[in-house]
Amino acid sequence: MRCCLKAFRDSVTRSVKIYGLYISIYIIHSQILRNSCHAPEYGKNGILVMGDVAVTPVPDPNQLAQIAVCTAQTAKAVAGIENPKVAMLSFSTKGSAKHEVVDKVVEATKIAKEMAPTLDLDGEMQADAALVPEVGASKAPGSPVAGEANVLIVPSLEVGNISYKLVQRLGHADAIGPILQGIARPVNDLSRGCSIEDVYRKIGRAHV
């Protein structure tokens, strides 16, 4: 099922009514693949996976942890990232700032590590610490993810949606998504602002 003629919320609501949810996943989330040809040094040859950018406005720690683990699985299955390195993003790196929203990311990181103990996942960390090796080494020494992240987990939908659209438009990145997870059948959605190229890329990913 593919949707792009109405608001994303309507597409998700109808998809859930028609197909239902996987029993093991109590929340739907989505992520976007960004093939950034202008910045191949980031992610895996310029490919980054981000979640959640379209569904859950303010995830709690448990929801954020599940988003992280499932997004890593999608990075491996769909984006060809054999070794996902998941960064739990915040405006703080390893306790550099104190706030309740930072605490949420810290708690989500702990839960995600318990859910997937073999997954390379770390946080909380700022985006530059996650992506730039020199910054990561300075701000989060010893982290298995800092400076090498290819999966970015944002703390809220507001952050994710704004971030990916800025990167897409200002950074000239190819946005492929959102890729929905948690629905019992494959469902894909496209922004009403998408281009013909976006449609072609999404069709290709839908058949992976």
Show where each model-derived region lies.
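Anion-binding alpha/beta catalytic cores of soluble intermediary-metabolism enzymes, centered on
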Residues: 1-146, 150-207
